Amino acid sequence: MSVDRVWTFAESDYQYGVGPLRLRIERIDRAHPIRSDNEDWYPVEGVQVSATGSELSRRRVLVRGSRLPG
């Protein structure tokens, strides 16, 4: 996984927030999935990034496993 890449997650693919989330992922905790909606969701840590590329804030969210990189 490239630490420089920004991933965009639809509102339905992460918990919790409103609207799409642009995140530079720093860590995916694949050892501790949480089962919800008949899918595995994973704790993810990273930096939220604006549409213009500015860093906004650190975030910890659950992301639908099927939407995560590698």
Locations of regions flagged by a protein language model:
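Short aromatic-glycine-enriched beta-strand elements
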Residues: N38-E45
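Intrinsically disordered, low-complexity, charged/polar segments
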Residues: E45-G70
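Short coil-to-beta transition motif at edge beta-strands of beta-rich domains
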Residues: M1-E26
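Short, conserved beta-turn/loop elements at beta-strand boundaries and strand-helix junctions
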Residues: D29-S36, A51-G53
